[in-house]
């Protein structure tokens, strides 16, 4: 029996090598059950033999029973050993399962740690890049700080430059000045608002732009003027994000920041993005400041200008009218800022062919400027020139001629005193030369009839354009000698003005190359205004620059070519 059992065990051991773990566990359980049964059976037999042994006397038969009992005991010991080994195998199997499970958990953890390690490496690389960019930005800001400190030291020098050059410098800043309610935007009209009156308008609304935003605004001007939009845009976005975290979205400072970012987008010709930001800013300002606040008027005007740039004059007109209503209500109907808004509205109507309304708005603006700023204010000449261009488009040549002559006469009187027989404006010299053509020699000096213009420094770009337009009008009337006189005066004055500007800028470069480079960058950036031909002062902003070629249709032209009526955003040099 024992031999057979051993054989079975060996057979089982041979088969174990080919069994799976689950099969081994199952077979082991069966073996345990079999061994338990054998153990119980052997115990029963042993008990029976022991009972029999008690009843027998000591003889040969009792010895046989005792020998059988000993064999049964040995078998029980082997069964106990087999059971113990089987239980050890079961415990070992459970342990192996636990180890395998733990191994799988550790493998999953290793994979997760590898992924986290890779993520941390990527984050570290990104952080290092951001740190490098931040260090570069810090270095740039340090340079910008030094530059601004230097510019502040030159403030007295800047205050001493000519009035017309001041206007040109202001015009280069205008695209970003419109973001604040104290300089409500009018790119394209070029009617600059004085800071004192603008600040008063802002205070009337009970909201004042924080100094930190003005500093940021100036910094954005510098970056945008250099074409460094990759710096200006993130700077605006970061400031906007910080403001929204600290003050919430519906806060006037957030609206101001939205306006700044909108203008940067506008300079990049991203008109759709700019319009979305301006609409958001408008909603915030109406909610926080009220619908009749000057800042609301500024935002409405900015939005109207933006629509105008996209050719959406019909959509822009009601916005411009609402801005006009607010300014009339807050500032009064005869305030210069109202005239500025009237100029914008006139330009929108002119692009839609509403000439009666254009005349009304320009005439009203002209009356305000003459009353409040005086007849010698540059805005008076500019508005007259705009009104004259409107007359030209309608074929009202006589009215346009009258306005052109008024501009030239006033410019002459401002420089040389009242007009008399010995002191005549250039258009009178031109008409006299036309009447006396053939009698006057070709070698007549320019100074005899046009030298007065060389000293005209007040608003020479407007005068230059007026000379050209009146010359074109003379040419249409067949007054070729008079036309040539005015055109020659304009050409020579322009050349002299450019020479003066060149000399001045050479001197500036020698004194401060960095400042001059910055000035050039600002001038090249300013695509948001339309300028007349540049004069000695570098040019002044106006709502439109129109030269008429004297054709029968009365079409506007520039340098003999057809010029489209432009919304502010294009510049003629």
From Swiss-Prot:
A GO term from the CC aspect: cytoplasmic vesicle
Basic and acidic residues compositional bias, start-end: 155-176
Chain segments carrying region Disordered: 155-203, 553-573
Record flagged with keyword Phosphoprotein: yes
Expression across tissues: Found in a variety of tissues. Mostly abundant in brain and spine.
Function: Kinesin is a microtubule-associated force-producing protein that may play a role in organelle transport. The light chain may function in coupling of cargo to the heavy chain or in the modulation of its ATPase activity.
Subunit text: Oligomeric complex composed of two heavy chains and two light chains. Interacts with SPAG9. Interacts with ATCAY; may link mitochondria to KLC1 and regulate mitochondria localization into neuron projections. Interacts (via TPR repeats) with TOR1A; the interaction associates TOR1A with the kinesin oligomeric complex. Interacts with BORCS5. Interacts with MAPK8IP3/JIP3 and NTRK2/TRKB; interaction with NTRK2/TRKB is mediated by MAPK8IP3/JIP3. Interacts with CLSTN1; phosphorylation at Ser-460 inhibits interaction with CLSTN1.
Annotated protein name in UniProt: Kinesin light chain 1
